Amino acid sequence: MESKSDASVATTPIISSSSSPPPSLSPRVVLSPCAACKILRRRCAERCVLAPYFPPTDPAKFTIAHRVFGASNIIKFLQELPESQRTDAVNSMVYEAEARIRDPVYGCAGAIYHLQRQVSELQAQLAKAQVEMVNMQFQRSNLLELIYNMDQQQKQEQDNMSFESNDLGFLEDKSNTNSSMLWWDPLWTC
């Protein structure tokens, strides 16, 4: 009985009335077990491999990974990796476990397949839209060229009409063509 009271005294910080800072606690005092240890109903050790990646506030994260991979496999996998890669590995395991629960046959490969198929469909739609855009640009340029040609033809017809109706009628005598030729003769016979 004495050992239990000693253990509780050792983990409880002593508060003194002096202005000195409280004594420092050991490097990682576990106040609440990590989600993994809580779900596995075991004591969370000070150097628990799972504690940094499965906080007590998110037990569903460990539950999903544990359901697919198993706790011993997760621990073994994390111990083989350097600490810098463990966070990404845990996130990947949780993602793969969620995908496996959603699609037990294909897992994350099924999700990847669906995403690749969606990308292919979107690329086909994009190519079709680009072809339609090129066709519309071609039609627009043809229409502009047609409008320009019609406008030029209309201007030319107007110019021809105005030239024909010009006031040069005083030079020719429509009633007598011989008399008009006589009028011009003196200019060339000089």
Curated annotation (Swiss-Prot):
Protein name listed in UniProt: LOB domain-containing protein 1
Family: Belongs to the LOB domain-containing protein family.
Polar residues biased stretches: 1-11
Pfam families: LOB
InterPro entries (UniProt xref): LOB
Tissue: Expressed in young shoots, roots, stems, leaves and flowers.
Domain (LOB): residue spans on this chain: 32-133
Region (Disordered): 1-27
Annotated Gene Ontology cellular component terms: mitochondrion
